[in-house]
């Protein structure tokens, strides 16, 4: 492999490891994207998803809106409904707290449970919950209605400027969620972010942490490597 261009030797090694473990068959599951809420308590410097209350028509999608999107996805051949959302917006925004109280929900996580339950019952799509850093009881609640869940580990660095205003982005919180999901035998998607101020060694350390958790519990179904978008103006 000495005559290969930089990187190709690594690709060859990765390919050999993959082929030995799972072969060359590629599987996929079409999914429809359901952004249940774009409000978020975190203030990540790279985020292009979250919006403040003034920029959204409602703090949360209604169950009717969720089902409309899910049915469109089912007609298009989707098998899964990917619930994505900001983390615990009720802790930052009074509008989110008020909406949840008025609609009879204890928290955003409880509303995710209700929305996922409706999608599962009404459309047959398999909900995938991506509600961020959750505690064991919250993971267990969603486990009743979501065959799989996910949360990006992102990084093990606790000193990055982009996470300065993001209480749920501490390595301890993310790792605790990863471990709890494994202990509950929840098929889990995770991964790291590249380009947020971390070093190559930081990326390797984060990937090792994911691999070690999977070695203990066997629950990681996807490990994603996302590149960070340009910072928002």
Regions found by a protein language model. Name each.
Residues 2-60, 64-65, 75-80:
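N-terminal [4Fe-4S]-dependent radical SAM core
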Residues 51-212:
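Conserved Radical SAM active-site core
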Residues 226-233:
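Conserved small/polar residues in nucleotide/adenosyl-binding loops
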Residues 215:
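Catalytic donor/gating beta->alpha subdomain of glycosyltransferases that bind UDP-sugars
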């Amino acid at each position: 492999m000495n005559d290969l261009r930089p990187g190709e030797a690594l690709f060859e090694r990765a390919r050999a490891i993959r082929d030995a473990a799972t072969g060359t068959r590629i599987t996929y599951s079409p999914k429809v994207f359901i952004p249940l809420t774009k409000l978020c308590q975190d203030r990540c410097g790279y985020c292009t998803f979250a919006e403040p209350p003034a920029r959204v028509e409602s703090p949360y999608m209604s169950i009717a809106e969720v089902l409309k999107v899910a049915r469109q996805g089912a007609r298009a051949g989707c098998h899964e409904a990917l619930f994505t959302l900001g983390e615990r917006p009720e802790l930052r925004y009074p509008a989110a707290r008020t909406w949840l109280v008025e609609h009879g929900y204890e928290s955003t996580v409880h509303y995710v449970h209700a929305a996922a339950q409706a999608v599962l019952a009404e459309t047959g799509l398999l909900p995938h919950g991506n509600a961020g850093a959750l505690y064991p009881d919250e993971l267990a609640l969603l486990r009743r209605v979501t065959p799989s869940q996910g949360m990006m580990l992102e990084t093990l660095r606790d000193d990055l400027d982009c996470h300065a205003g993001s209480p749920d982005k501490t390595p301890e919180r993310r790792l605790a969620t990863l471990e709890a999901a494994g202990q509950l035998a929840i098929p889990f998607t995770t991964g790291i972010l590249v380009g947020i101020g971390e070093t190559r060694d930081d990326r390797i350390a984060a990937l090792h942490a994911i691999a070690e958790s999977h070695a203990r519990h066997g629950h990681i179904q996807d490990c994603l490597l996302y590149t960070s978008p340009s910072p928002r103006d």
